Design a protein with these regions (language model features):
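Short Pro-Gly-centered flexible turn/kink motifs
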Residues: 78-83, 89, 152, 193, ...
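A contiguous, surface-exposed recognition patch within enzymatic or periplasmic domains that forms
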Residues: 2-46, 78, 85, 92, ...
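Acidic, contiguous internal or C-terminal segments within carbohydrate-active enzymes
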Residues: 67-69, 81, 87-105, 165-216, ...
């Protein structure tokens, strides 16, 4: 058959993603790894990490109002197909490559999640497992992983259809594009990626293509390397492969805990990674040299890791991840020069190698056998030539726009036109006026009319902006009295906070509160008070904000966490009684109630909540709050009832006699002997 691109529907049970959180993510804790506290990280990687990480995820907001109730849903997909492969992309969910079927054998090369179930694993909170995710800009999954990208049909000179996925990334302020295509007769899916830095200065850059493949006991991950960086979220070290401490770490079935292996592929060597099963068959990923990093992630065989696999999907659908990135590890950023354009070509196909060699005891022979078969599948010279041919279509305008993404790229295009700046992208990326929506509407008014419009205070604000150019426009408008309303002051406070002008932010939010008594300004002022150690004021402001919007779950959760952190559990329990049942019955709220109850010695309430088996929809990756609460509860209960101190002996006894029930165990490391207290 001839290569084709078509639009279809993919049906699966899906949880509701819910609306975005209207609260700006001012507090960046938990967004990024605290790498400075992890031993073994090389100095140069640590420096690029510290220099490259933003203080928070602004201007993005969190996607944290999803549920775990699933219902049948049809997703819009793009399908690329030729005689060898059929590739399916979820257009509404970050352009995720969801399925890649090798047609002659009928083999699915990726792990296809049978459900869409968001969980709290990404910077914006919501993330889902399965397929191939395109991660740009910052560590912690793409800001677009649960959002629609622009999608367009482009055609090569020979008529081969190309699926172009693209967006404007707002933290690094760069456009990126993904051109996926399947030429006639190709046994490999090609994915050509381009990132452009349109600025006059350097930009910290990050890209990782994360590939989920089925996990089986006999699947082995191979790459052309004799050593790796190992990162288990507690330490960072170098180990030899395949064996470390007597264990063959290239099989996930041998690894007890979650962790990453970053392969040391020599400079100049062809970068690839593959996961053949016991028959020597599985996905192989290869690229041109720009995409130099390769990583193997697994959840581990521990109870917590197994629980996470089920939490993200359904029993029996476990996966591991093969990943490919610009840098050698994910603990670093590369400095992208001013005006630079970075491009590379990725290939995805079926590896068929000799299983006896692939799973043999000679590691070098094992990976060399895969490399030999890769050279037959897609020779290195052929991949390089295919990449060079991409210059012919990379700037070609779309034949058809299949889907629009956000309106932020169009707004940036209009701002640049108004200020006389050069365009940030070629005609190959269309950010049209039709993509502009409610989030961009007030900023468009500011740009064209010089005034910021107001909306009703009871409507959830959205459309955050932190760029200096927009702040200057808003500062000028407000100082001149053009739209100095509650919403303008609210946004200006966020901009000042982002620019580390805390006093200015406080004044702006106080002005917003004078204009309208909103939970939005009260909450932002509460964050400032908490950060400054003005706890009495923070409690008062948080309680006021919650009373103004008692049905807003993210506000209630943040309020509960903060009041407990400040040592005010009784204030939280008192406020909890005022919240509506739709909030009080949520699993996260139940966890916070139990933590507060334990803090005041109310063992009966803690026991009742555990008996209700709360499900915390937004359990964070690496979070141990449930298991810590379980251990702390039993330690304190036994200490009181038996009049004994909480010491190492009691902690050990609790872990023996009261193991964490499976539904509460999300631990990713083997530190069961430690306690939160």
């Amino acid at each position: 058959m001839m290569s084709e691109l078509r639009i279809e529907r993919w049906s699966m049970p899906a949880a509701d993603l819910g609306p975005e959180d209207p609260l700006p993510p001012l507090r960046g804790e938990g967004d990024f790894l605290d790498l400075e506290k992890i031993p073994g990280v090389p100095d140069e990687k640590l420096k690029s990490w510290v220099d490259g990480n933003p203080p928070n995820i602004l201007p993005y907001t969190r996607q944290n109002r999803f549920t775990r109730q699933r219902h049948p849903r049809d997703f819009r997909i793009a399908v690329l197909e030729n005689e060898f492969l059929c590739a399916t992309f979820l257009l509404e969910l970050g352009g995720r490559l969801w399925s890649l079927v090798h047609k002659p054998s009928g083999r699915e090369l990726l792990q296809v999640n049978p459900v869409f179930q968001p969980a709290n694993l990404a910077l914006r909170n919501a993330w889902f497992s399965g397929g191939v995710e395109w991660n740009i800009g910052i560590y912690g999954h793409s800001p677009f992983t649960c959002s629609a990208l622009f999608a367009a049909r482009v055609e090569r000179s020979d008529g081969t259809p190309i699926l172009r996925l693209y967006e404007w990334e707002r933290i690094r302020q760069v456009p990126f594009q993904i051109d996926a295509y399947l030429p006639d007769g190709s046994p490999v899916l090609f994915v050509r990626v381009r990132i452009v830095n349109p600025h006059d200065g350097e930009v910290p850059m990050y890209w990782w293509s994360n590939i989920a493949v089925p996990e089986t006991p006999d699947t082995r991950v191979l790459a052309p390397a004799g050593s790796t960086y190992r990162f288990d979220y507690r330490k960072f070290d170098v180990i030899s492969v395949p064996k470390a401490e007597g264990i063959d770490v290239t099989y996930s079935s041998n690894r007890t805990r979650a962790g990453d292996l970053f392969f040391h592929i020599p400079d100049g060597h062809r970068p690839w990674i593959s996961a053949p099963d016991g028959e020597g068959k599985g996905l192989v990923h290869v690229s041109t040299e720009r995409l130099a990093g390769r990583k193997f992630f697994c959840w581990g065989m521990g109870l917590g890791g197994r629980h996470w696999q089920e939490f993200l999907s359904e029993p029996g659908h476990t996966y591991i991840e093969l990943q490919a990135g610009l840098a050698r590890t994910q603990m670093e950023y590369l400095s992208m020069p001013a005006g630079a354009e970075w491009s590379w070509l990725e290939g995805y196909g079926l590896m068929e190698a000799d299983p006896d060699v692939v799973h043999g005891t000679d590691w070098t022979q094992a990976w060399q056998s895969v490399e030999d078969m890769l050279e037959r599948l897609i020779p290195r010279a052929a991949l390089d030539a295919e990449f060079e041919r991409g210059a012919d279509f990379v700037d070609r305008p779309p034949v058809e726009l299949l889907q629009r993404g956000s309106g932020w790229g169009a707004l940036e295009r209009l701002r640049r036109e108004a200020s006389g700046e050069a365009p940030f992208c070629s005609e190959g990326l269309v950010f049209d006026a039709e993509s502009l929506g409610e989030a961009q509407s007030p900023w468009l008014s500011l740009l064209h009319d010089g005034a910021f419009p107001a909306f009703k205070p009871d409507v959830e604000p959205h459309g955050l902006m932190v760029r200096a150019q927009w702040r200057a426009l808003l500062e000028d408008a407000v100082s001149a009295g053009r739209g100095a309303n509650w919403l303008a002051w609210l946004h200006l406070g966020v901009m000042r906070y982002y620019a580390r002008d805390r006093d200015g932010a406080r004044r702006a939010w106080e002005m917003s509160l004078e204009e309208a008594d909103t939970p939005w300004a009260a909450r932002n002022l509460a964050v400032l008070a908490w950060e400054d150690g003005r706890f009495d004021e923070a409690v008062e402001l948080y309680v006021a904000a919650c009373r103004l919007r008692p049905s807003l779950l993210p506000l209630a959760v943040e309020c509960g966490r903060t009041l407990i952190d400040m040592g005010r559990p009784r204030d939280w329990l008192g406020l909890l009684a005022e919240l509506p049942p739709s909030v009080r019955t949520v699993g996260r709220i139940g966890l916070l109630e139990a933590q507060a109850a334990l803090a005041i010695g109310d063992f009966e309430s803690v026991q009742r909540i555990f008996a209700e088996k709360p499900v915390v929809d937004d359990m964070r990756e690496g979070e141990k709050s449930l298991s810590h609460l379980w251990f702390d509860f039993h330690e304190q209960r036994l200490s009181v009832t038996e009049n004994i101190p909480i010491d190492d002996a009691l902690r050990a006894r609790v872990r023996r006699e009261f193991p964490v029930p499976k539904q509460f165990d999300f631990r990713m490391t083997s530190d069961e002997s430690t306690s939160s207290g």
